[in-house]
Amino acid sequence: STNGMGGCIWDWVDQAIVSYEDQKAGNLKVNGYNKYRNGNDYPQAPHQGNFVNNGIITADRQPTGKLAEVKRIYQYIKFGTLNKTAKTFTLTNKYEAIDLEGMMLNWQLLMDGAVVEEGSTTLPSIASGKSQSIGINYGDVSGEGEYLLNVAICLPEATSWAEAGHAIANTQYAISQRTALPQADVNAGTPLTLTKSGTTYTIEGENISMKVNTSKGITAWKQGGISVLPVDSETSASPTYSNYRWIENDAPYGTDPYYETGNGISSRTFTVKANDDNSAVTITENASGSRCDYKFVYTVNRDGTVDLDAQYTVTGSNLRRIGMLMQFNPELSMTRYYARGPLDNTIDRKQGSDLGIYDLPVSAFHVDYVRPQT
């Protein structure tokens, strides 16, 4: 055959359930997560294990980044290339029996993620299978910065399945790209000071202060006077090696070695040294363990930035994944960023995630996938 087909969605929803027994007992959470069951919980019946937990929404019907991607790719209104000189593009109606006449076209002009102009117009008649050139008379885009044009085709009135204003098709055009950001000047600011009292070193600079214990690691860290670490950081503050990650939901099943939760690290030592002109302080952590040894080298720069170089050496046969674990001050609960969002996206799943400025709680960055991506 000369034809091929791909990108099909096997399942709309993760096929996991809450059992009757758990509902009756009120046993709906495990370690803070929803307790769902899959085929593995019913060995007496034919099943496919966890395989059918591959939907684009979660078992409790919450959207995921996969849903945003599918919606953008499947949408039945196609946007042609933007003619930046004429400020026009072509709309093609892929619906079988719907005319686009009366649909609302809403647009926003963004510069570096911020809305600088917006407008709305009503679409003319565009019959099924037909195309129409559409013009948007947005303003000046000659300033420095990255200009983007967001376009959405929206319902003018509520329907039985969506409210008025619901977007049935979207796109984002890049009108211009911003120039490269200036490289950070790590030597900005006054030289750092390094002092020692007992087993604790103190690093001080204009924008940073840090305490490092030679047996515990980093126990205090402030940026601009704000604590980066939790208050009880005396016990575990430094980033540490973590391999607590396995295919089926990090489940600690019995004594199976693949589900051990420890990292196998038996010793950690820390050394601290300033360079000759106090423009940087280096913190070196060496650790040994049954699964791997590692060496972390932190470079604290006078401008307040911290670079971390991590090197791992495998020592055992059951090393599954290499990662790092660090806890932050819980008061640092909000983020603002200029990138793709607002749902999770990856380099090969980003068409449904537009560039913009997003203000989100840290909790929004956690997605309860039934099965971790592997």
Predicted regions and their residues:
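Beta-strand/loop-rich accessory regions of lumenal/periplasmic or secreted enzymes
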Residues: N137-E144, T159, A174-T374
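Conserved, mostly hydrophobic/aromatic
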Residues: G7, V70, L91, V151, ...
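Short acidic/polar inter-strand loop motif in beta-rich domains
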Residues: I153-A162
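Short, conserved beta-strand segments of beta-strand-rich sandwich/propeller modules, principally
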Residues: M104, E146-N150, D307
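Intrinsically disordered, low-complexity Pro/Gly/Ser/Thr-rich segments with frequent PxxP/GP/PP motifs
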Residues: L110-E144
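Extended substrate-binding grooves/exosites of carbohydrate-active enzymes
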Residues: S1-A86, Y95-E101, N106-V115
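Asparagine-centered strand-capping/turn motif at beta-strand->loop junctions
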Residues: L91-A97, V314
